[in-house]
């Protein structure tokens, strides 16, 4: 059982994430047929067939505290509006984490702060039998450390972070990180922690492709947003632009005023799904100002801002607390004949609780 108190949440026993459902395969599982080699210039693709869907679910009370002790009978899950059967087996699922850090030239004064959090990632995030890899990106995508459970190697890799060019290939870094996570054993949970600005600079891949891959591989994306601290150091804040996410889709913090629209969002039924569908379909050109928000929101993750070493460390702790306080709901979709976007909605049959989970996943239409 997970303890919602901050002090005890990080104990070894609380780092075991609960999984509802027999995990035939981790995340959304796939059968992949051999494919002929593709020309190097093409964007990386993922060939997938959905079998089992896993939906990490965070439950908060009115004060914003994690709610523990729920059972399978407290949850209802809907896939495209159709109720799905959740099985009640409980298992332990160790964590595989990629830490992807923007290492561009404008971060010269900020990287020393980020270099110090390697030990915290091991102590506060990974948990029992956890492993991490470290990736740096500017105009290159560099793997500084492949997956390891060795805290010393993780810390050493973080200390290798150095500023490079002015580019920041955020989308390409997400795609490559998802590929790394997809190769991990099937019994591991997959998480990507981005430490970056909100906007991509010079990626070759598309947001749609990276997001589709993350959802199909059941990768939860969390982010530590460095935009505020960049503005603090450079004195040049980027001009604000309207969010691509409707105002009603914004998260209401614990203790905030609830409205009918915000309550719909917390049950995953808000009106921001159409924008996500347009991203997947690429039916028209859509300007997405904040790619990080799209990655975190639509994979069930969350983003945190920081402006100091202390707030950075608190953000890392908050990520660990959430990951190890979640319920992992698994089910076999019974409606895979419905091609396109499958919206996931989770309800808790107890009053005045806030629920956050992944919004859904994309399924190719069957011939």
What are these regions (language model features)?
Residues 4-23:
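Bacterial N-terminal signal peptides that target proteins for export
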């Amino acid at each position: 059982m997970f303890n919602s108190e901050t002090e005890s949440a990080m104990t070894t026993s609380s780092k075991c994430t609960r999984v509802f459902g027999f995990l035939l395969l981790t995340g959304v599982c796939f059968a992949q047929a051999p494919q002929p080699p593709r020309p190097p210039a093409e964007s990386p693709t993922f060939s997938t067939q959905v079998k089992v869907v896993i939906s990490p679910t965070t439950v908060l009370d009115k004060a914003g505290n994690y709610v523990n002790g729920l059972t399978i009978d407290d949850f209802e899950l809907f896939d495209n509006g159709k109720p799905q059967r959740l099985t009640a087996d409980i298992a332990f699922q160790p964590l595989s984490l990629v830490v992807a850090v923007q290492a561009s030239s404008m971060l010269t004064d900020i990287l020393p702060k980020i270099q110090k959090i390697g030990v915290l990632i091991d102590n506060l995030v990974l948990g029992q039998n956890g492993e991490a890899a470290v990736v740096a990106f500017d105009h290159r995508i560099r793997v500084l450390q492949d997956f390891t459970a060795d805290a010393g190697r993780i810390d050493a890799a973080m200390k290798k972070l150095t500023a490079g060019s002015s580019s920041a290939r955020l989308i390409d870094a997400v795609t490559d990180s998802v590929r790394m996570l997809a190769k991990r054993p099937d019994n591991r949970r997959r998480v990507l922690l981005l430490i970056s600005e909100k906007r991509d600079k010079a990626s070759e891949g598309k947001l749609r492709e990276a997001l589709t891959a993350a959802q199909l591989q059941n990768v939860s994306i969390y982010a530590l947003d460095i935009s505020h601290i960049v503005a603090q150091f450079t004195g040049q804040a980027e001009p604000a632009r309207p969010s691509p996410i409707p105002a009603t889709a914004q998260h209401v913090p614990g203790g905030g005023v609830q409205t009918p629209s915000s309550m719909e969002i917390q049950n995953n039924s808000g009106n921001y799904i159409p924008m996500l569908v347009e991203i997947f379909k690429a039916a028209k050109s859509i300007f997405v100002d904040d790619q990080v928000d799209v990655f975190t929101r639509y994979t069930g993750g969350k983003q945190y801002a920081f402006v100091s070493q202390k707030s950075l460390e608190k953000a890392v702790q908050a990520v660990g607390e959430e990951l190890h306080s979640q319920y992992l709901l698994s089910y076999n979709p019974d409606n895979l004949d419905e091609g396109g976007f499958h919206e996931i909605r989770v309800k808790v049959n107890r009053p005045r609780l806030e629920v956050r989970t992944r919004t859904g996943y994309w399924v190719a239409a069957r011939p």
